[in-house]
Structure formats: structure tokens, C-alpha cells
Amino acid sequence: MNVKVENIEKNVVKLEITVDSEKFNEAVKKSFKKNAKRFNVPGFRKGKAPLNIIKKYYGEGVLFEDAINFCCEDTYPKAIEENNIKPVDYPQIDVVQIGEGKDFIYTAEVTTVPEVKLGEYKGVEVKKVSYEVEDEAVENELKSMQEKNARVFLKEEGEIEKGNIAIIDFKGYVDGKAFEGGEAKDYEIEIGSGTFIGDFEDQLVGLKKDESKEVNVSFPEEYGREDLNGKPATFEVTIKDIKVKELPALDDEFAKEVSEFDTLEELKSDIKDRMKKELSEKAKAEYEEAVVEAVGANAEIEIPKVMIEKEIENMVRDLEMRLKYQGLDLKSYYEFTNSSEEKVKEYMRETAEKRVKTDLIMQEIAKVEDIKATEEELKEKAMEVAKQYGQKDVEKTAELIANAQKSYLEIDIVNGKVLDLLVENSKEIA
């Protein structure tokens, strides 16, 4: 095998790879073995005609397609390894020379990992991030717990008041016509919750069970549906039932019922401690992100478009998986959000570029600092991931993960070490 390398443009190289005629003939024979059964030649049972007859009957090129694939699969990986080329995508293969008794020559044009010029990455100055737990946040959490433990019962007599729950049938019209998604029966709505648009809920105050009313509202300009944005609408509403929500008193008895604590003060203290922990983790994550951004701002990289496009595709696949768990698909998501594949991808572009840049910087720092993942760390990481699957045989699952996802585990471990290095060497400023 002979290889010539030509730099076509920045981050794009073309390899001209020559496979000697003997090797190519072996690939042709291999192709014949693979395809022999599909050839039907008069005078021979199907699949039994010899190679020389097949060539005469069908032409020598009939076996070239698979022979080319065999040669490329064998020689291309060796060529990029020998020339220290790190591709970021599949190559564009073009045949230069092919034929019986000839050397097989082809070119492989491929985009490569870009050069990363690191700037200052140790000692970057980053503003301190900190959060305090507000008393209001604790009170809001208590109110939320109070709401979850409220007693709800039917209101036998009287009108709808703020805070009541109305059971309604409704049908909406825009421009005199019913619209999709504008109708429901036995719908529960808490008056004053702001669930519905405009003052829809306020217009129900004062109504009694079995009464009906036309409610007039306007959809917000940015409602998210072109057929409804900014348009006035009329809803025919019928009150089916009225419910009253009775909140439990916030006292020691409440604390005993909803927690392991004996007093309300102990419950408040626990809520505050949990919030402190959450805010501390949030501050840590934001500080780490700020450190990485500062390091990124000091680096120079010309990212190939194909890397960004690949990351966008990964993000779309992740979105598709998340939607699947919710019983949705991409088509439904696009319709619901009044979007499209093109709009979503464009929205993801900035984040994708940021992710690719960060990954490249982390890899380059790991290379400069000689940061690697040890076998012990790989085992621990695999075990950590395996436990999340909830399988009985965790050790066996970890072993499977370690083998199948080794490269991903290594990247995760190395990136974590690089992040620790950057944070430890950063300068926190007020």
C-alpha cells in the first residue's frame, strides 16, 4: 500500500491510496465468494459458474463494487493511522484507477480534527457564584406541601369564588368557527390559578352549578399557534360542579403528617437545609461553566461545519429519545411547538458549536497535561452507570458497559479530571 497526502484546505485532506494489483485481485476473489450464489449462467447450475466464466459473461466490473469496499475497509484505517490523521466524519471515496491486472488507486477526502490553540487555561479569573436561601422560598415550599395535602369536597350551594375548583365543559370559537384543541368536558380548573388565557377564570366567578356563560378572551400574540396568535375567542362554558379546597393548618400536626419531624420549625429547618444544598450545587455548576467559558474565550479554534452538524444530529436524537419516554414523537413536538426540523436545528446550532468547542479544548488540555483514565477509574465509572440500570447482576452489567462504552467512559472521566484541574487553578473574584 502506498499513500500520498494532500492538504486541500484547512482541516480537509485528500489521501491517494494505491493497492497493488495482487491485493486487489484477492479482493475480487473475495467478492466472488460472497456473490457467487446470485449469478445465473447458462450451462451451469445457479451459483456454480467459475470466476473466469462470470467475468466473461457479466464483465469484469461485476465484482468490483464489493472488491472496492473490501480494499477500502482494509487500507483506509491503516492509511489514516500511519499518517496520524484524525477524521471527524466518513471519507468521500473516489476511484482513480481500477481494472484487471492493475493497481487499484482511490482517493479519500476527509475532514480532520481542527488545531486547537490554547490560551491561558490556568489562573483564569471568574466571578464568585453564591446563593442565599430566602425565607419566601421556604414559605412557598410549605405552601406547596399544604396544597398537595389539601382536602377537596363538593360545594353543594353557592357561587364560584376565587380559590374554588370549577368542573366545566367548554367549547371555543375563533372567527365563528370551532378550533382544534378548544373543547373539553369535565375539565377541572382552579379559579385564580392563571391556567387559562386572559381573564377567562375571573369571568366564571359568581356562576352557579349548571349555569352557562359565553366567555370572551383574546389569545396572546405569542401563543405559539399561528391560527390563534393574537385572535379574539369566544368560549361556551357550562358549570358542571364546584369544589372547595380546604388547606390544612401549618402547625406541628401538619409537620408530623407530612414528614418525619415533630414540629413545624424542624420541618422548616429541613426544607432550608435541602435548599441550601441545592443552591450550593447550582452555584458550583455555574462556576464550573463560567471557568470553562473563560478558558474557551482564550482559545482559538476553527471548527469544521461537519462537526457542528453531527452534534446537532446527536442533539435531535437525544430530543427524540426524551419525547419517546413521554409518549410523543418529533412530528407531534413540531406541531405542538409550531416549529419544524429546520427551526429546531437552527435553535440548537449555538449550543452545538459551544459543546464541540468545549470538547476539543478539554481534549487538547488533557493531551498537554497528559491526563488519562486508569483501568480502575473505568471499572468504577462502569459500575456507577450499571447501578443506574437497576439490573440484578450489577457486576456483569458493569463489565458489559466497560467493554461496549469504553471510549465514552474514558472521555467522561478525562473531561472530569480536566474540569477539576481548571477549577482548582482558577481565581475566584468578587
From Swiss-Prot:
- What is the annotated localization of this protein? Cytoplasm
Enzyme Commission number? 5.2.1.8
Q: What Gene Ontology terms describe what this protein does at the molecular function level?
A: peptidyl-prolyl cis-trans isomerase activity; protein folding chaperone; ribosome binding
* Keywords assigned by UniProt, alphabetized: Cell cycle, Cell division, Chaperone, Cytoplasm, Isomerase, Rotamase
**A Pfam family of this chain:** Trigger_C
- Where is the PPIase FKBP-type domain positioned along the sequence? 163-248
> Mind listing the GO biological process terms from this record?
'de novo' cotranslational protein folding; cell division; chaperone-mediated protein folding; protein transport; protein unfolding
Q: Which InterPro entries match?
A: PPIase_dom_sf (IPR046357), PPIase_FKBP_dom (IPR001179), Trig_fac (IPR005215), Trigger_fac_C (IPR008880), Trigger_fac_C_sf (IPR037041), Trigger_fac_ribosome-bd_bac (IPR008881), Trigger_fac_ribosome-bd_sf (IPR036611), Trigger_fact/SurA_dom_sf (IPR027304)
Q: Which reaction does it catalyse?
A: [protein]-peptidylproline (omega=180) = [protein]-peptidylproline (omega=0)
At the top level, the lineage of the source is Bacteria
GO CC annotations, alphabetized: cytoplasm
Function, in words? Involved in protein export. Acts as a chaperone by maintaining the newly synthesized protein in an open conformation. Functions as a peptidyl-prolyl cis-trans isomerase.
Q: What is known of its domains?
A: Consists of 3 domains; the N-terminus binds the ribosome, the middle domain has PPIase activity, while the C-terminus has intrinsic chaperone activity on its own.
Q: Which family does it belong to?
A: Belongs to the FKBP-type PPIase family. Tig subfamily.
Q: What is the protein name given in its UniProt record?
A: Trigger factor
| Organism from which the protein derives | Clostridium botulinum (strain Loch Maree / Type A3)
